[in-house]
Amino acid sequence: MRSHARPANTWARRAALLAVPSLVLGLAACGSHSSASGSSGTGPLTFAVFNPFSGPDASFGPEQLAGCIPAAAAINAAGGILAHKKIVCKTSDSRGDPADAVPAAEQLIATTSSLVGVLGPSSDEASATVPLFNRARIPMFGDTGQAVFNQSSFKYFYRITPPDDAVGYAMAVYAHQKGYPTAAAVFGNDISSQGSLPTVVSGFKKIGGKIVLVQKIPLDQSSYRTEVSALIAAHPSVIFTEADPQTSATYLAEVKQLGHLGPFIGTDGTTQPPWLKAVGNAVGAQNLKHFYVGAQPYAPTTGVPYQQWLAQIKAVNGQVSQPASQWYGDSYSLAAWDSINLMALAMVAAKSTDPGVFRPWIVKLATPSPGAVVVHDFAQGKAALEHGKTIQYVGATGQVSFDKWQNSPGAFSIVSSDGSTKVATYTSAQISAAK
């Protein structure tokens, strides 16, 4: 999956393209302190976007930030959280590498005043940094897809996007429904790119397909002629794939040069604009449109919650990475918006910004209960809570249904080469056929 997952080499062009300010919404950075445990004062509260903003996965950070900025702006417009009238979205660049991410996380925890929540980590650095945030008692909504967090004991870890293994099953189901009898799996050899590899292989086999080749290719090589020749010799009817943009572009360009470009299905790591642009340039836009689809978590693009999200992000269009329209239907940006709203409403419900106090309310506010008022954004929820109502938050990604490990499994969509147009949608029950 986008294991939130892709390699950890440098791709400077994309990093430059997606450069964003280190602190948004025009608010100054807060002072330093030794731990993050909410605030009893009235100063700004900080939500951190802890994701790659540089390196091959540099698109992950802006994608999460595109959810944080509109949520924070709307919270500020609604009067803030308790005595805190300003909410800050702060970026922290993990660089997509655990070696860089650990000191970055430690610095974030040690120096950010009133840090009350984190968007992230991604799969690139989650295993190394989730324990740090958990020990510091900071709620985090991970965009990691790693299966290791399917049943984790981290009390401050939440996830409302499906794990990588589920993405692999969705890819397998779609390939089977399209009638592809054989498949090759071509994935980058970094850990993060391979989150969906085991399940797309096992799932495709279970529902009757044949895997004719599995390749774990080294990243960012100048040529993959040997690997491509082996692929062609295996005669797959479809390719399952994830690697970083540069690697995928080089590999698929050589497949095209040898006259064997055919259908390929990517993880949600491939549905990002940098990947689609790089591969589209390499194989041609028409070929990308004709042969490619990608699997990603489903997010509805109709209904009242979506319209709330759309209105709020359009209100801050100039503050997110451009073009802003790329985030309108992005399931991870929508999930980030929901995550900020849930944490903010949990503070209001708990009457505290101390994570140890408000953390249990995150699950409570997402869970249906008799007589609960259904709300779709922070302002609605705050108003209802202040009038003594019980609420259920149903946001842009739909109903959040946390399991005992604080994961919320969801549906999947298969999207076209624009990264958003849906060509198929599967519920979690439907993809279970491949498990």
Write out the residue ranges for each language-model feature:
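Extracytosolic ligand-binding ectodomains
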Residues: R2-N9, R13-K435
